[in-house]
């Protein structure tokens, strides 16, 4: 039996919130407040879809460097989220909340969060956890649809690669518990990749340093992970035109609000056009080689191997046989093939390496939350009465998932 029927699962990402009733449908809402180009309009969350001009938008996000710090912004976004999932009551007293937080969330942030949950929204019960801790639940099917069939042999040992907006974490989960001593962080996330693409385009093509929204759309449309970086760089030097080069038509806001890839290079285009070649794979390459921009850290494959070395060899082998990727950066074409290839080259030859690719790595933790057993929820939740008795210090008295 899963979570209680009035439990809202809220995967509180720094870029997008994924929310909905456990076992129901998930909604994705931008976790930000956006100011329009002229400064006269503010868009909260998914109201941004009503914007007619995405140039020079200014974003105020509730998170800084991956952690929740702007409480007034988050309160406003959560109000919108509750309406979007179908809660119309002013009080949440009849509802429970399962909320995700990043690994290593500071106690001060946890205390402010629990105050927001019980004092501002008045939830009846609350359970915080990391997205990675939700992945092993319902190990038998590992997902809600056949596309995500999971056939790993050791569900008690899962290695989660969570690569999102702010950073990438390598998180071993054993017996449904994060092994914090072995968690590794790579300071490369979607925000850094978009900012780097802005710099590259602005230096080589047009000045787009203020066009975060547009450049992010370009990144998601054209970028991919190279399987052979040196070979692809050589291809990009082909004349007169590299087979990797594409044309991207920028939005002009008269014929459309969004840019698009020009499939026919002979087509007459009225909009400004970006020609992109090695930019397409240079940007995601930072996930595997942060040192390219002088970030002195290991890439994801090396960080995985550094993480598993904290365990005995038999556990290391089980973790590498159960690697699961979540987060928006995992959607780059070629990401899983490159990751599998590099892990295979780093692991001992007699170990099996399996990297499982959810069909929707962004919403996958949210979907897995619905399979948490009711007895586990009841044993670990924090109730409003407990909060009333102990205050925010209840966080130190209760064992988290």
Swiss-Prot record:
The UniProt entry's GO CC annotations, sorted and at most eight, read: cytosol; nucleus; Swr1 complex
In alphabetical order, the GO MF annotations are: nucleosome binding
- Highest taxon listed in the record's lineage: Eukaryota
Q: Where in the cell is it found?
A: Cytoplasm; Nucleus
| An example Gene Ontology biological process | chromatin remodeling
Q: Write the record's keywords in alphabetical order, separated by commas.
A: Activator, Chromatin regulator, Cytoplasm, Nucleus, Transcription, Transcription regulation
Q: Which CDD domains match?
A: ASKHA_NBD_Arp6
The record's listing under SUPFAM superfamilies reads: Actin-like ATPase domain
InterPro entries per the UniProt record, alphabetical? Actin, ATPase_NBD
The primary location reported for this protein is cytoplasm
Task: Give the family from UniProt.
Answer: Belongs to the actin family. ARP6 subfamily.
Q: What task does this protein carry out? A: Component of the SWR1 complex which mediates the ATP-dependent exchange of histone H2A for the H2A variant HZT1 leading to transcriptional regulation of selected genes by chromatin remodeling. Involved in chromosome stability.
Q: How does it assemble?
A: Component of the SWR1 chromatin remodeling complex.
What name has this protein been given in UniProt? Answer: Actin-like protein arp6
What organism, scientifically named, is this protein from?
A: Schizosaccharomyces pombe (strain 972 / ATCC 24843)
Question: Mind giving the lineage of the organism this protein is from?
Answer: Eukaryota, Fungi, Dikarya, Ascomycota, Taphrinomycotina
